[in-house]
Curated annotation (Swiss-Prot):
Its EC number is 3.1.-.-. One of its GO terms (cellular component) is host cell cytoplasm. The keyword Nuclease applies. This is Polymerase acidic protein. Phosphorylated on serines and threonines by host kinases, including human casein kinase II. It is an enzyme of class 3 (hydrolase). Its cofactor is Mn(2+). It comes from the Viruses. Mn(2+) 2 binds at E80, D108. The gene is PA. The lineage of its organism: Viruses, Riboviria, Orthornavirae, Negarnaviricota, Polyploviricotina. A motif (Nuclear localization signal 2 (NLS2)) lies at residues 184-247. A motif (Nuclear localization signal 1 (NLS1)) lies at residues 124-139.
Length: 716
């Protein structure tokens, strides 16, 4: 049968049929009867439209080989044979220009003379049976149906056959020929029997047994049976007065719908209190890197070897001392912990063979910093369920904190460009389909805009730290393992670079559940003097550990080098998400893509190139107290990426709640801006839900202050 199809039909038709089958995951080599049926249907659609034109006087005419210069327009638009997206685009544009009702299913043709869509059917069964199936499926008075059979019969809506006798005879003759050719090869019987009816989904399938009982049990109040609930739903007119509808739904609801006007919304109330503090798992804008270019030392790529090599590039070490103590901690222990790291690194170098990993000695200072033996003893529930006054610990309410300016500075820094590239352009094979070509073009443009972005550095740093910590937590559960904080990048000249930010020492890590906590101490290099914004560093003990020579415009200057030390903790599930931070790139790329798609649909062509290469155009980036901030497309890419990265770095229940609840208010405000006259009820309750998430988290507080700027400017 496959050979017959390839001989019998025009190659273009065969190719279209193969494409259509592939789109539905069907194989022309296996489902050969279906292959033949699709080709036949395509050919009938093309023959239906062939030679039919509309002339200057809008009269329908038939031209088989006439004056090529005549001003003729095709009478039929062919929809069948296009890919789904394109086909719907054509249907939509016809509906928009002619005002014809949009069909529910894709039709085959559009007739510009009669102004109607046509559904063509070709059947191996009785024409009237097939006609009824088609009509039952499309359920539209507006779409005209025309059925042909291989026996020369036809049937059409209201016996209106659209075409002249001769054109239809051509189609019937061709179908008869196909049938004879098949029969002579012994293919007809199998082909005739393989036709399945139109698949229509029954509107009402009966529910019986357990499902029926469950349905009756789960009805809303005031409904006695599924039938009367169905009748109510079917008769429910969605437009009209909302209050009435609500009271119709339930006797308990009495919502007053208040119009939402420009004067309605008030700004969100941000909490008072001391300024909020840094709570990320590693330093961001304040981090300092010791690095080696073009690493080629022995054991290159083994973190401990790389770290020792980076440490050796710095010569300004000095006796460490505490410059900003941690309010609640035993600060000398932090100092001793750093001295221990230096001493143990020195010991490694004195050994003949450097080990691949380093477990720290379990000294008093590390046991204290890692909370060893601090956790209350776990008791099996069976042993204590009879205790009469068993209860959970009383926990204090979190203390409110106010928004501090450092978090906006952190965000601004994350949007900036660095002088290194943090991700490679993915080596992906040749594009096969045009859509892949557009996708990889977008990916390449986007990568070029964000590869040097500081937020991308944070992604790679986060992925590295979380991967290393999770590995060590599983591989060395009882050990206090020393984990270097490393990242890799390329310089402008394309040279490889390995960076060391500092070290982590992990505590005991018997992590059975996703939420079991592993404690760690982080020690990170920085040039930031903590005394400038002490509130930011509330959770840290900061040491001064050396002096660094920096090249500036006026020559070399010496700056003190600090070490930011703190106790921290994470869990398996947090590390798992940290390892997947690269998803932030994907999320922001998708946001940019939807902007490109919007442009492209207006211009009706792919706008990717223009979008990225038109440097003069500016785009809205965000709201600030000054109004809407605008910037280049690159700036938009980097801002969206930074938002996504900060959502990951500062993930918290407060952020989840704020995002979900503030979105509702945002949509209402946008509806007002679009003059949709929104109405609300219990707006106070919505404000309460949003504001209960504004406690002390720096990223949530910053988002809330941005939200207030948006409210101010959006509703001016």
């Amino acid at each position: 049968m496959e050979d017959f199809v390839r001989q019998c039909f025009n190659p273009m038709i065969v190719e279209l049929a193969e494409k259509a089958m592939k789109e539905y995951g069907e194989d022309p080599k296996i489902e050969t009867n279906k292959f033949a049926a699709i080709c036949t249907h395509l050919e009938v659609c093309f023959m239906y439209s062939d030679f039919h034109f509309i002339d200057e006087r809008s009269e329908s005419i038939i031209v088989e080989s006439g004056d090529p210069n005549a001003l003729l327009k095709h009478r039929f638009e062919i929809i069948e044979g296009r890919d789904r997206t394109m086909a719907w685009t054509v249907v939509n544009s016809i509906c928009n220009t002619t005002g014809v009702e949009k069909p529910k299913f894709l039709p085959d043709l559009y007739d510009y003379k009669e102004n109607r869509f046509i559904e063509i059917g070709v059947t191996r069964r009785e024409v009237h049976i097939y006609y009824l199936e088609k009509a039952n499926k499309i359920k539209s008075e507006k779409t005209h149906i025309h059925i042909f059979s291989f026996t020369g019969e036809e049937m059409a809506t209201k016996a209106d056959y659209t075409l002249d006798e001769e054109s239809r005879a051509r189609i019937k003759t061709r179908l008869f020929t196909i049938r004879q050719e098949m029969a002579s090869r012994g293919l007809w019987d199998s082909f005739r029997q393989s036709e399945r009816g139109e698949e229509t989904i029954e509107e009402r399938f009966e529910i019986t047994g357990t499902m029926r009982r469950l349905a009756d049990q789960s009805l809303p109040p005031n409904f006695s049976s599924l039938e009367n609930f169905r009748a109510y739903v079917d008769g429910f007119e969605p437009n009209g007065c909302i209050e009435g509808k609500l009271s119709q739904m339930s006797k308990e609801v009495n919502a007053r719908i208040e119009p939402f006007l420009k004067t309605t919304p008030r700004p969100l109330r941000l909490p008072d209190g001391p300024p909020c503090s840094q709570r990320s798992k590693f330093l961001l804008m304040d981090a300092l890197k010791l690095n080696i270019e073009d690493p080629s030392h022995e054991g290159e790529g083994i973190p401990l070897y790389d770290a020792i090599k980076c440490m050796k590039t710095f010569f300004g070490w000095k006796e460490p001392n505490i410059v900003k103590p941690h309010e609640k901690g035993i600060n000398p222990n932090y100092l001793l912990a750093w001295k221990q790291v230096l001493a143990e690194l020195q010991d490694i170098e004195n050994e003949e063979k450097i080990p691949k990993t380093k477990n720290m000695k379990k000294t008093g200072q590390l046991k204290w910093a890692l909370g060893e033996n601090m956790a209350p003893e776990k008791v099996d529930f069976e042993d204590c369920k009879d205790v009469s006054d068993l209860r959970q610990y009383d926990s204090d309410e979190p203390e409110s904190r106010s928004l501090a300016s450092w978090i906006q500075s952190e965000f601004n820094k994350a949007c900036e460009l660095t002088d290194s590239s943090w991700i490679e352009l993915d080596e992906i094979g040749e594009d096969v389909a045009p859509i892949e070509h557009i996708a990889s073009m977008r990916r390449n443009y986007f990568t070029a805009e964000v590869s040097h972005c500081r937020a991308t550095e944070y992604i790679m740093k986060g992925v590295y730290i979380n991967t290393a910590l999770l590995n060590a937590s599983c591989a060395a559960m009882d050990d206090f393992q020393l984990i270097p904080m490393i990242s890799k990048c390329r310089t402008k000249e394309g040279r490889r670079k390995t960076n060391l930010y500092g070290f982590i020492i992990k505590g005991r890590s018997h992590l059975r559940n996703d939420t079991d906590v592993v404690n760690f101490v982080s020690m990170e290099f920085s040039l930031t003097d903590p005394r400038l914004e002490p509130h930011k560093w509330e959770k840290y003990c900061v040491l001064e550990i050396g002096d660094m020579l920096l090249r500036t415009a006026v020559g070399q200057v010496s700056r003190p080098m600090f070490l930011y030390v703190r106790t921290n903790g994470t869990s398996k599930i947090k590390m798992k998400w940290g390892m997947e931070m690269r998803r932030c790139l994907l999320q922001s790329l998708q946001q940019i893509e939807s902007m490109i798609e919007a442009e492209s649909s207006v211009k009706e062509k792919d706008m990717t190139k223009e979008f990225f290469e038109n440097k003069s155009e500016t785009w809205p980036i965000g709201e600030s107290p000054k109004g809407v901030e605008e910037g280049s497309i690159g700036k938009v890419c980097r801002t969206l990426l930074a938002k996504s990265v900060f959502n990951s770095l500062y993930a918290s229940p407060q952020l989840e709640g704020f995002s979900a609840e503030s979105r509702k208010l945002l949509l209402i405000a946008q509806a007002l801006r679009d003059n949709l006259e929104p109405g609300t009820f219990d707006l106070g309750g919505l404000y309460e839900a949003i504001e209960e998430c504004l406690i002390n988290d720096p990223w949530v507080l910053l988002n809330a202050s941005w939200f207030n700027s948006f409210l101010t400017h959006a509703l001016k």
